[in-house]
Structures are given as C-alpha cells and as structure tokens.
Amino acid sequence: MVVVSDSRVRMPRYGGVSVKRKTLNVRVTTMDAELEFAIQSTTTGKQLFDQVVKTIGLREVWFFGLQYTDSKGDSTWIKLYKKVMNQDVKKENPLQFRFRAKFYPEDVAEELIQDITLRLFYLQVKNAILTDEIYCPPETSVLLASYAVQARHGDHNKTTHTAGFLANDRLLPQRVIDQHKMSKDEWEQSIMTWWQEHRSMLREDAMMEYLKIAQDLEMYGVNYFEIRNKKGTDLWLGVDALGLNIYEQDDRLTPKIGFPWSEIRNISFSEKKFIIKPIDKKAPDFMFFAPRVRINKRILALCMGNHELYMRRRKPDTIDVQQMKAQAREEKNAKQQEREKLQLALAARERAEKKQQEYEDRLKQMQEEMERSQRDLLEAQEMIRRLEEQLKQLQAAKDELELRQKELQSMLQRLEEAKNMEAVEKIKLEEEIMAKQMEVQRIQDEVNAKDEETKRLQDEVEEARRKQAEAAAALLAASTTPQHHHVAEDENENEEELTNGDAGGDVSRDLDTDEHIKDPIEDRRTLAERNERLHDQLKALKQDLAQSRDETKETANDKIHRENVRQGRDKYKTLREIRKGNTKRRVDQFENM
C-alpha cells in the first residue's frame, strides 16, 4: 500500500516577495505500507513523525520511532527535535525512513491498546523471527506459523484451503526448514493441522496469541550492543523493557548478569566510557566501554526511553490512556457482538445447508421409489392385458362348445363336468384379474401420494434455499466490521538532543527512582508454564519434529537452547537467577568476566 501525503505549507511573504523554501521528498516504510510526503527544509523529526502517526491512525506513539540509514551505513533513530535535513540521513531521493517499534512492552496483553499497534508489533516481531534476528526453536516456530496463518487467512476451510494453499506464504525461519528432512507438503500439513485448532479465533486475537508466545523468547525485545569491561573482555550489553543484561560474546540467549531499571538512578557517558550509578550508594559504579561514542549515545537514549516506560507502567494511567483503553473496550465489545452475529449466521447457514441436503436426499429417494412404482404399474398393466386376452379366448371356446352340445349328447355328463371345470377356471381367472386391478389401483394411489409428497418436499427445498440466501446475506453483513477513526495526538518524548558526531563531551541523565518497586521478574512465568494446553502442544510438536531432525544442521543457538532446556532454564528463570545478590556482587562479577 502506498499513501501519498503533502505536508507542504504556504510560506509568508517578506517585502512583497514570496520566500520559497526548499522541499524534500521522503518515503516512510511501515511494516505493511509505504507513505510518501513532501516536507519543508525546516521540518523537524517530530513533525515528520507526527505526520506519519496521523496518517496511519496510531495513538500509542511512545513505542515507536523513525529509523534511517546514516552515511556510515548504520541504522539510526531520528532525533525528534532536530531538523530532518540536519541529520545524517543517507542522501537519496526520496529520503528513506522506516517506522518501527523502538521500545517493547513488558506484557503485550496488558499494554497494547489499539489494533494498529498490535498489528505493527506483530508484523515486526514475526519478521524478526523469520529472519532469525530473534531465535525461535522449531516447535515454537510451527505453532507461531499456525497463528500467523489464522491472522492472515481467518478460519481454515477444507474446501478452499486445499494442498498447496500455503505454498507462497513465508511462515518458518529458513534455519528450521534446513534442519528437518521434511517436504514442503509435510511442513504445510503440519501447520494446517495446528491452524485448524484456532477455528473461530479473530485475526487480532491470533496476532495477540502470537505475541504472547513470542515475548517469552529470550531475544525478544532486546537491543544488543558490543561492549568491553575494564579487563578488555568482549561482551554484549542487552537493553530491554525489564532492564540491562550482560551476555558473553558467544551466547546472546543466556544473560549472565542483570540489573533491573528499579536499581538504576543515573546513567552517563564520557567519550567511549559508559557509567551506570546504582540506587545502592554503597555499590560501585557499573562501567563499560563501547567501541564508538555514537554507540554510547544510542545506549543512553534507549536506557532513558525504556526506564521512562518502566516507571510509567507503575503509575496510574493518564487521562489520554484511560480514554484510549475505554475506546478500545468499546471497540472490542462491538467486535465481539459482530463476532457473535457472525457465529449465529454461520450456524444458521450450516443448519440450512444441512436441512437442504436432507431434503435433496429425501427427494432423490422419493424419485427412486416413484420410478420403481411406475415399473410395477407397467408390469401390472401388461399382466391385465394378457389375462383379458385369455378371457376372450376362453369365452370363444365356450360359445363353440354350446353350438356343438346337441351333437355331443352321449358325452353330456363328461362335457357338463368339463363345463363346470371351465366355469371354475373362469371365476378364478376373473378373481385374479380383479385382484391384479386392485393391486394396480393401490400402486397408482401410492404413486399419487408420492407425487404429492415430492411436490411438498420441492416447496420445502425452495424455502430452505431462500433461508440459505438470507443466511448468506446476514453472514456478509456480520463479517463487515465497522471502521473507527482514531485521532492522532502529539506525544512529547523526553529524548533530548545529544552531542553530535563522535566527538567527546560528558552526558549524564538522572533517572526517576522508587525503592519500593517490586521487580516484575519475581512472579513472571512463561505462557507455556502457565498454560497446560500450550505446554502440551509444544511438547507434541517437538516429538513430531524430532523424527525428521538433522542434528548436523544445528546452529550454536540451537545447542545453547537445548542445553538451557535440559537444565530447566527459561527466560524468566534465568533473569531471576542473574539478579540475585546485591548490586555490588553483580558489578564485581561483571568486572571479573
């Protein structure tokens, strides 16, 4: 989808002369659309950002940012309060920007309000999983693929969703496909089997279920940066919604040391050195070194944003957020009502189709019975014709016998006996004819009755077809969801302008703190641990895939994940473990890595 917008505004005149300012063409790519704008040379990053969110109807702006490729080829987030032209955007026409999630929620089910927000997160996370930016084990990949199919195609329909239907859909990481000796048809069948489990699930609900599973993956929502400690050991710093984590160079799945945001009171950097001051003033500063000053700037900005959202989640919702949630509830209720109408319409249609099929089967049976009755009637009529012919022959013989009676006086007694026998035979024949005529009449009556029944059934079939047409119309009406317009709002982020370039300069930021905040990791459990059905699904998938697994194709992450599972670790158990002990002990542990 391409949306073109013109944000040019009329410039004032000075001394009677119109001052024409230079305009720039920009293209902003979201996860499912391309937006094109013409902006002024004075347009700031925030003005461009506001134009984008207004165009797509997004109000949960605090999660998102505009990303661009700078002159050095690195991905950089646009600075909101600096002119677009003055930022190090790669010189192209149009200028290229990507609208992406910059910060992730702690819990998607609790925080994501708008459907557009849900969709953007879903598409971004799905893309990260498919490209292996986020590691996802094979069994989870297949289950997520089934939710992705539900989100895209709706309910499985065995009539239209036949073999090969998913051939053009990108559903699994290439790594997972390469690691298993399965054909495309076998992968498709596996995904379609689980897809059928999601029947009647709304597309938005399928996206939410996808994200609820994905957020338990170890690499979900983590921004990684290469750093070194004082000893010069190469490590990874992970910044996410829950805090800061330290990883060894060859393992980005399993953090070794963790610091929740609630323990940090100040962050700063000087040149390549980054300093984190804990709330515990007895603890030493947590210090590391980045390869370039610009990396420290990005770390600082991400720390500030994530910490801001971390604290905001633990405060009462603002009026704007309360209104958004109320509106979202209304929309969800309306959608639920539409869903119920749709289900009723579907059920009515199924009943009508079933009844029509029953009528058609019954009509076919009646027609077969009628054909049999017609054959019986023809046979009876032929028998009557033969019996009548025999009766005529018998009467002719009797007449001839009476004419010769005088000549046969000597044989009178014998002839009389013969005559009596013929009379009995005649009566018997007449009785047989009458019985057959009665049988024919009975069959004819049955045929007439069947004919009436057939006409009645035909009327019922027509009525069933009419009801089916009404049900189809109701189904079409029920499947048309009302659209709501969302008014974009201005959102002022606290990301201040930092020093330009890679030059020196000390930058320090105090963070809002609250010593009474409980670490959310303490009670956090993965969805698979809380949901027995999901746990069983993943277990069954893992067993199925094990039969075709090619262990020679395992990656380093596969081996790390398998070892973590063997030791009973998951994302939240690991985070709880690495946050144990006081801050000083963890800082010392980092210095000794």
Swiss-Prot record:
First-listed, main subcellular location of the protein, grouped into a coarse class: other
UniProt keywords, alphabetically: Actin-binding, Cell junction, Cell membrane, Cell projection, Cytoplasm, Cytoskeleton, Membrane, Phosphoprotein
Entry keyword Ribonucleoprotein: no
Modified residues (Phosphothreonine): T574
Biological processes annotated in GO: animal organ morphogenesis; establishment or maintenance of epithelial cell apical/basal polarity; neuron differentiation
Bias (Basic and acidic residues): 507-571
Membrane topology: Peripheral membrane protein
Pfam families associated with the record: ERM_C (PF00769), ERM_helical (PF20492), FERM_C (PF09380), FERM_M (PF00373), FERM_N (PF09379)
Alphabetized InterPro entries for the sequence: Band_41_domain, ERM, ERM_C_dom, ERM_FERM_C, ERM_helical, Ez/rad/moesin-like, FERM/acyl-CoA-bd_prot_sf, FERM_2
Cell compartments where the protein resides: Cell junction, Adherens junction; Cell projection, Microvillus; Cell projection, Rhabdomere; Cell membrane
Segments forming a coiled coil: none
PROSITE patterns: FERM_1, FERM_2, FERM_3
Domain FERM: start-end pairs: 24-314
CDD domains linked: FERM_B-lobe, FERM_C_ERM, FERM_F1_ERM
GO molecular function, one term: actin binding
Acidic residues bias locations: 490-499
Top-rank lineage group of the source organism: Eukaryota
One GO CC term on file: plasma membrane
Record keyword ATP-binding present: no
Region of interest (Disordered), ranges: 477-571
Assembly information from the UniProt record: Interacts with Mer and arm at the adherens junction. Interacts with cytoskeletal actin at apical buds of microvilli in the precellularised embryo.
Function: Involved in connections of major cytoskeletal structures to the plasma membrane.
UniProt-recorded name of the protein: Moesin/ezrin/radixin homolog 1
Taxonomy of the source species: Eukaryota, Metazoa, Ecdysozoa, Arthropoda, Hexapoda
Gene that this polypeptide is encoded by: Moe
